Amino acid sequence: MIHETCQIHSSASISDDVDIGAYAIIDRNVTIDSGCIIKNHAVIRENTSLGKNNTVYQFATIGEEPQDLKFSGEDTKCTIGDNNKFREYCSIHRGTSKGISNTIIGNNNLFMA
């Protein structure tokens, strides 16, 4: 189910069986594969790809801009594998153009803030 109050960019690609909660934000160029659950108030930022069966809990942010003072809007990415859990208030950032431009997370992980 996709809640009526969430915001989904028109360029996002979301599998039919994904659940997206109230006030969640799905940004441009986001891909969310089957079985994912995006809870209320979670944020998935641009150029982020989520594999299958991931859960993003409330107030977590995935694919935010890098926390790097040299970052100036370059096209960077965040790639998430399958079966991960991102608990409340967790933040995962995209790579930087000066280093590795793609943050890659594998499968079967638990992230907590």
Located regions from the model:
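Short, flexible, glycine-rich and Lys/Arg-enriched loop motifs at helix boundaries
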Residues: E65-T76, T96-G99
